[in-house]
Amino acid sequence: IGAGMCLMVVIWYALATVLSGMLYQVLHTTNLPNWAVYVASDTPLYLVAMPLAVLIMGKSSVIETRKFDMKPGQFFKLLVMCFPLMYVGSLIGNMLASLLSGGKASNSVSDLAMQFDVWNVVFLVILGPLFEEWIFRKELISRTRKYGEKTAIVFSALFFALVHMNLFQFFY
């Protein structure tokens, strides 16, 4: 499982580096437009690195997700409970990033998300969450569930945070 996930990151970075270099050459620019940045970064991840990671992890036994009934009121109650946790997590991430950078860190993901661009919607709102939920929740948790439900969730969350390499989002 770990080898598959590590290989995913290595393949992703290698292919993204090659593809972005090619796009710089083809577009004759030193500053890639948003669509080109997304194509260079996300295409190798979604179409090559993630599927290869799943193939490598394929030998590990999969334990399917159990289904639980939840009434709308219970869902709403849990949702409301999550907001303060997210806020506190955001504060911790901001304080840690500020502390470690001497106050010079900036939240590039937040800055990028604030720009309205159709490519942001496609890659940050639609494709990103779909592929990330698939790999980190479905594939990773179902393969680590044999170590316990909580362990699987924590492992998935930690790997999600490490792959994003963003202290601002680390505690979400």
Over which residues does each language-model region extend?
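N-terminal, membrane-interfacial amphipathic/helix-forming hydrophobic leader that caps
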Residues: 1-84
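Transmembrane helix-loop-helix hairpins at the membrane interface
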Residues: 120-172
